[in-house]
A protein has these predicted regions:
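Enriched for short, Lys/Arg-rich terminal
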Residues: 1-6, 17, 28, 32, ...
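Short linear functional motifs in flexible/disordered or boundary regions
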Residues: 27, 42, 49, 81-82
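A short, surface-exposed loop/turn module that caps and links secondary-structure elements
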Residues: 35-62
Length: 88
């Protein structure tokens, strides 16, 4: 379900240094995918694990070289980015 206004995006504190050290192409690809996710947080990506609630999501970016995991809080209209992996 797409929303007219994007959800706010918060990053786990531990990701601050990792975000600064990502290559430029990774940061650009991540920003593009998170913008899309912010407008359609549950419709984007896939469920992180079948054993976790539907709000735990996973999405690939950068032609599959990156992965971002996030939790959707519809109540607070926020996305909480918990993990980023870049193998590019």
């Amino acid at each position: 379900m797409a929303f007219p206004d994007p959800f706010a995006i918060d990053f786990a504190y531990e990701l601050a240094n990792q975000l600064r050290t990502l290559p430029v192409e990774a940061r650009i690809a991540l920003a593009e995918v998170l913008e899309a996710v912010a407008y359609d947080p549950v419709g984007s990506g896939v469920r992180y694990l079948a054993t976790l609630p539907e709000e735990w999501r996973l999405m690939f970016f950068g032609d599959g070289a990156g992965m971002v995991a996030y939790v959707v809080s519809a109540k607070h209209r926020r996305l909480y980015v918990t993990h980023i992996t870049w193998a590019g």
